[in-house]
């Protein structure tokens, strides 16, 4: 009873704090509040509080159930939210790049934890005895590596999607185009002295507009480079986690079912996801290929991760069906 109450309190604390963090962060985007009362630092500290809250929640379920809390979809979602909070803390200690990652980790954490605690998962929030297939020492190794891999790959893929949005956004002032048309009309209406004054004024405005354009494009270029840099680093880390998770799962499957690979739906989609991100890393090693191509591949990988993670849970079939929406 005590563990259940403690778990309930920690769940609501972590969800409430991450909700406040998200509101604060979007307020700092709309209004420069961080210079007034330091709201942005408060949001970073809020994520740290969320991290310890989710950690306490996982430890409570571990002690209460007697097994590592990764036996169903609810627990895996909480663990995934915990993984996003870890990524956020890494960005917190790296002050130069924290803003870009915060825009990804905070909304992701609140969305995942909100879905996990929304009541859509039937009886999954209640701890239960492990099914025989999960009673193995490989549970912690395999599932934790897969979830950490999902978290890192999702974060890196979202950065790639942001890169694509910024890249394909139409940028470039049309001031000089309008200015040319205006000068043609003025030449027909005014004398030389008046035109000289107007042209001088327009030249100053045009130069200011060009300087602003160069400044904006330079910032845009720097932002694209940073997004590409961090996307590659985080996806590389997630790819390592995913590889270790798949290999440990193969060893576990051989011990349980006598075969390393059974082409289960979850296994098949995990292999497809692994292949897509292997292609992404291969593209990144080729300097002749533009970064936008790798970002497109990472965006495809983002969709595949959700298919792999939720696809089997929606269908409720295969060797991994014990974590489905319909299981009790």
From Swiss-Prot:
Domain of life (superkingdom): Eukaryota
Pfam families: Cytochrom_C_asm (PF01578)
UniProt membrane topology term: Multi-pass membrane protein
A molecular-function term among this protein's GO annotations: heme binding
GO biological process: cytochrome complex assembly
Subunit record text: May interact with Ccs1.
Matches recorded under NCBIfam families: cytochr_II_ccsB
Protein name per the record: Cytochrome c biogenesis protein CcsA
Organism of origin: Olimarabidopsis pumila (Dwarf rocket)
